[in-house]
């Protein structure tokens, strides 16, 4: 039986670089940092006083009455999905053939913390009746599904910082296995709050460059000292190829395969051997019926942690072999910060734009490239990609040892 092909027909985003895809992409190619000092009072009570907040507040894009009943992560999901759906041409589709798979690594944590404060300071009568649907990890997916009346299934993978990529992979399988014709997929996160930031700081996971926030996220730099927490979301409309052609849809590229693995090593540390990452790359290429020689670009997970960046780079070098020499590697968290469960989704949006423009975005803030990093990093300015048929990888990893690799192919 001929396998159903899956293509990307719509994109949406709200990020530290912009409130839509076009603005975000322009900022990325310009090497702009979305990291800024925090102005909230609580920021002065924790060791790290900066983060990558969204560039455009939801209050500038949504009605106040809608915002009041939604967690910030749900707001990001609706903003990005509305842009993506419009970009896809607002397709007419049988609702029973329309699905939603949108992930979050943490869910409505800011709602939980804010409502707990209200309970403690003002009493139970003032706790919002919207609290439970606002804090549910599946809230973003559920709200998007309700707005679009999706009936093929609404799902929320939760695999820490691999969640967004896993959501796209799940959506890919829904279409490939004939459970849906269109699936709205991606990931969101809104965790810039005192407790999550204090917790990550306690793990020594965050950069502490309070005096220079814009240069704090520095994947692959010899003096990197941790990641920068970001927020926002990315959404992709995935569609069965013949369905998209029949309605005359704009087609960005094809999702050709995915690879999943787990490390079985540690709850929070990467396996220094990189064996799990290598397996995920191998599985993804096999699923896509491609070889390492077909890959010209990779958007790395590269969060700017001392251990993680090198472990990933070594694993990629081992997985790609000598072909790694012609793979342009971008570490876009240097500009957006780390969106946790939204990272793999927004970075998939970036790969789709890279495929469209044939331009790999830069990695900024590398003063001294760590000599232990042996992949070809795109530094400081964008790099043109080859003409003709090309393929690219997006890899995402999460606490717990989750590894996800997605394969994108020109069409």
Please state what every model-predicted region is:
Residues 1-4, 37-79, 107-170, 179, ...:
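Conserved catalytic cysteine-centered active-site region
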Residues 1-66, 242-254, 349-363, 409-411:
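ACP-dependent fatty acid/polyketide chain-elongation machinery
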Residues 74-95, 99-104:
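Feature captures the FAD/FMN-dependent oxidoreductase FAD-binding
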Residues 77-86, 140, 167, 239-240, ...:
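Short, well-ordered amphipathic alpha-helical segments that serve as non-catalytic structural scaffolds
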Residues 1-8, 92-95, 288-294, 325, ...:
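Flexible, low-complexity linker/loop segments at domain and module junctions
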Residues 10, 28, 81, 100, ...:
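Conserved small-residue
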Residues 5-9, 34-37, 211-288, 297:
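Condensing-enzyme catalytic core mediating Claisen C-C bond formation in acyl metabolism
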Residues 179-225, 258-272, 300-309, 326-376:
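Acyl-CoA/ACP chain-elongation machinery
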